């Protein structure tokens, strides 16, 4: 499976699970539900083997922003119950 197929599969799963539209996840929207969906997307992409620079290109963010999301995912998950639920129940395989 190529990178774009992996990205498409995972972003669609995240969108379905979080009920946040794909275009909103990829936007610069900063409401909590959208940001949680974006963090979940980045973490799942990272877990699937994509490099931060590859993720950055797909989500239209900087590599630094992607690294920040990866580094702070578990901290954000501790403060957000829904993000933890999404992480524990999302099956992206």
Kindly give the residue locations of the regions a language model identified:
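Short alpha-helical "recognition helix" segments of helix-turn-helix
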Residues: 54-58
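Helix-turn-helix DNA-binding helix
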Residues: 63-67
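DNA major-groove recognition helix of helix-turn-helix
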Residues: 46, 70, 77
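Short, amphipathic alpha-helical "recognition" segments used to contact nucleic acids or chromatin
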Residues: 34-50
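Helix-turn-helix DNA-binding elements, focusing on the entry/boundary residues of the two helices
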Residues: 11, 51-53
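Short, Lys/Arg-enriched anionic-surface-contact patches
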Residues: 16-38
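Short Lys/Arg-enriched helix C-cap and helix-to-coil transition segments
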Residues: 76-93
């Amino acid at each position: 499976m190529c990178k774009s197929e992996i990205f498409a599969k995972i972003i669609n799963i995240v969108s379905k699970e979080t009920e946040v539209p794909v275009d909103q996840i990829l936007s610069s929207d900063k409401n909590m539900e959208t940001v949680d969906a974006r963090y979940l997307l980045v973490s799942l992409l990272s877990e699937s083997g994509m490099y931060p620079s590859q993720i950055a290109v797909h989500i239209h963010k900087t590599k630094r922003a992607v690294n920040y999301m990866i580094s702070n995912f578990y901290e954000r998950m501790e403060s957000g119950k829904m993000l933890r639920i999404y992480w524990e129940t999302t099956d992206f395989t």
